[in-house]
């Protein structure tokens, strides 16, 4: 029996060695594409700043960040014991916090045109709307969770059009976008699993672009797709690897958050500036960014999935 086990182990080792030397063990084509696009890029001229939270507050696993019209910073994190929603001023001073016991996996946070704050839970698929002071105003149960045994099987992000339409990225298991009216009544849904136009493999982020179209970070397909608010496919840019986020600045500058498929999650993250008319990559910042917010002055606020609250301010 010992000899047989040794033979089995030897065969496994030989197979693993063969795979590592073969195309099957090589980098996947998407990762090769991403590296070919990002490696030649210049680093963007920014200053890295780490904000100190005052009074001292332990941030744990920052999942998403948003900013509001007052320049405040809204952080959604995953504390072991504390409030997941924290509002700070631009200097890092805590203004208020809330949400303890209301979340399983806090995932997305956004501010709507009226200044209200919305959160998305990736485990329960519950979307919550809060007033700027933290009073709960609305709850949307997205539902239709295919496999409740999975920790991540729910919604990921939310976006708004100026006329009050709400779009939820129901991304981890359902590969769809669900539209609601301002009262939380479901209007329609669109999208399905796959690699073709209008198909997704993890709808990880959604945002309304300068022209009013919906831009979606199709994470595992390594691309951005964009659509009309009614769900009609308009186009796509494929960058390869994993594409976590897409964001626009107040002046229309476009950024995406990228990561190769074949390395640890703490390595080779980039926030990349992209020409919004062509999809050409223009420059990058080396930082992990699960989600991304952009301040009114163009500062980048990456959600680092750590306790570090960072911003990257453009140099004047």
Which ranges hold each PLM region?
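Bacterial N-terminal signal peptides that target proteins for export
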Residues: 2-13
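Initiator methionine at the very start of the polypeptide chain
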Residues: 1-2, 26
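Bacterial N-terminal signal peptides
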Residues: 11-22
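Eukaryotic scaffold repeat domains enriched in small/polar residues
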Residues: 27-316
């Amino acid at each position: 029996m010992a000899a047989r086990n040794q033979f089995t182990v030897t065969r496994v080792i030989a197979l693993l060695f063969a795979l590592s030397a073969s195309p099957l063990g090589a980098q996947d084509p998407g990762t090769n594409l991403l590296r070919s696009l990002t490696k030649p890029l210049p680093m963007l001229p920014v200053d890295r700043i780490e904000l100190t939270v005052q009074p001292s507050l332990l941030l744990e696993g920052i999942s998403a960040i948003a900013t509001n019209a007052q320049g405040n910073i809204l952080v959604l994190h995953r504390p072991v014991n504390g409030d997941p929603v924290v509002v700070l001023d631009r200097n890092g001073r805590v203004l208020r916090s809330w949400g303890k016991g209301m979340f399983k996996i806090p995932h997305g946070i956004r501010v709507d045109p009226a200044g209200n704050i919305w959160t998305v839970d990736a485990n329960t698929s519950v979307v919550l709307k809060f007033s700027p002071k933290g009073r709960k105003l609305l709850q949307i149960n997205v539902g239709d969770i295919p496999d409740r045994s999975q920790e991540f099987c729910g919604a990921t992000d939310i976006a708004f059009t100026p006329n009050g339409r709400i779009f939820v990225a129901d991304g981890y298991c359902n590969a769809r976008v669900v539209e609601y009216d301002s009262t939380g009544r479901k209007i329609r849904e669109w999208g399905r699993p796959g690699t073709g136009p209008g198909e997704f493999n993890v709808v990880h982020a959604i945002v309304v672009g300068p022209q009013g179209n919906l831009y979606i970070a199709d994470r595992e397909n390594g691309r951005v797709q964009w659509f009309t608010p009614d769900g009609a496919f308009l186009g796509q840019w494929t960058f390869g690897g994993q594409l976590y986020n897409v964001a626009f600045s107040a002046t229309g500058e476009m950024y995406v958050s990228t990561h190769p498929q074949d390395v640890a999650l703490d390595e080779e993250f980039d926030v990349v500036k992209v020409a919004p008319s062509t999809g050409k990559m223009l420059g990058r910042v080396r930082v992990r960014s699960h989600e991304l917010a952009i301040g009114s002055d163009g500062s980048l606020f990456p959600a680092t999935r750590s306790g570090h609250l960072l911003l990257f301010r453009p140099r004047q």
